[in-house]
Amino acid sequence: MVVGDLHGHMGAAEWLAARALDEPGTHVVALGDYADRGDRQLETLVILLTLMLELPGSFTLLRGNHETRSMASRYGLEDAVLSVHDRAVMDAVHVVFAQLPIAAHRADGVLCLHGGIPSGARTLEELSAVPKGEEEPLDGTAIEVLWNDAEERAGGHGPNWSRGVGRTFGLDASREFMERNGLWLLVRAHQPSAEGFVRLHGGRVVSVFSHPGYLGGATDGAVAIVGMDRTVEPMRIFLGDREAVAGSEPPL
């Protein structure tokens, strides 16, 4: 099970926790962006960190573009933490964020990451070599993995005008990287969609977003179920009334 952006949606995190605990044979990979923007940011983060500790080896948290000090300060997590805890707790959260991996590779050819294929890395080994420990990633490959957007077009990498950081990647970029590294599927997050699940690049790239009603919109949240038989299907997150999310800024 692969989980996209949650952005402080505690209901979706509780939904995920129930399934992770009830189905111990399922390996869960969460793709980052756990807080910021939602109204239950701290609670959502606590649920996810608890699952990571309670289910070692079967619940993996990756780093997204919001797991940095600057994003936490701008989009609300820092305020949420400091409203009930002191600065030392926020500093500890950033230590955890800085140690999260930026990608996860399943041996049968599945790659999971938050944003997208980087322009400066050609192999999985290069992704594995990206240094951890930086509160604000400075490595160009790390920045692109966290920030790149998928576009349904031919071609390779292009400028990311909408975000002003990272790049976009098209079919040629994903196909070249995936064929070189023996991958049949890339699962990534980062971009909201109406149904929370989008197939791109001939079905070899799946984009998943797990916050229902993001920014107050009439959108679903979903996770991706990736089978060992190379099936990939969405599972909708049904919670009844969607939680409203404060703010109207363009998604970052």
Label for each model-derived stretch:
Residues 1-252:
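Feature recognizes metal-dependent phosphohydrolase scaffolds
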